[in-house]
Amino acid sequence: MALPASMRLRGHRCFNRLHRIGRRHHGDWMVLRVMPEEPRLLRPELRRHPTRCCRCALVISSKVSKRAVRRNRLRRLLHQHLRQQLEHRGDLAGRWVLISLRPEASEAEPSQLLEECDSLLSSAGLGQ
């Protein structure tokens, strides 16, 4: 199941800001960036509806897999996992998270990706 709209991070200004100043946590198959939210970078309609959780985004480029089916499966897997991990944690409100998969991620088993995602979330102070 996809992330609800209230948990999604959208817009190139948000992504650029996360890439520039976000705190990085590196794993074998992904990089997690996290930073405090900056509502002024959000679109006006999103600013009016503050979220009770952090906002998340996934970047899965065509370098991970040339096949859109494979990239979409990875995206759905990680969206579902993030939703389960972060949805009911009010203490995480006010943070933005960006997860970028590395090209090697296509060779990893789904369980390995989820395990690494958990360890990166924990190292960023977002895990349980």
From Swiss-Prot:
Name the source's superkingdom: Bacteria
SUPFAM superfamilies in alphabetical order: Ribosomal protein S5 domain 2-like
Query: Which Gene Ontology molecular-function terms are recorded?
Result: 3'-tRNA processing endoribonuclease activity; ribonuclease P activity; tRNA binding
Q: Which reaction does it catalyse?
A: Endonucleolytic cleavage of RNA, removing 5'-extranucleotides from tRNA precursor
- Which keywords are on file for this protein? Endonuclease, Hydrolase, Nuclease, RNA-binding, tRNA processing
Name the InterPro entries on file.
Answer: Ribosomal_Su5_D2-typ_SF, Ribsml_uS5_D2-typ_fold_subgr, RNase_P
* Cellular component GO terms held in the UniProt record: ribonuclease P complex
E.C. numbers: 3.1.26.5
Bilayer-crossing residues are none
Which Gene Ontology BP annotations are present? Answer: tRNA 5'-leader removal
Q: Which parts form a coiled-coil structure per UniProt?
A: none
Could you tell me what this protein does? RNaseP catalyzes the removal of the 5'-leader sequence from pre-tRNA to produce the mature 5'-terminus. It can also cleave other RNA substrates such as 4.5S RNA. The protein component plays an auxiliary but essential role in vivo by binding to the 5'-leader sequence and broadening the substrate specificity of the ribozyme.
Q: Subunit details for this protein? A: Consists of a catalytic RNA component (M1 or rnpB) and a protein subunit.
Q: What HAMAP family does the annotation carry?
A: RNase_P (MF_00227)
Q: Which family does it belong to?
A: Belongs to the RnpA family.
Protein's UniProt name: Ribonuclease P protein component
Naturally occurring in which organism (per UniProt): Parasynechococcus marenigrum (strain WH8102)
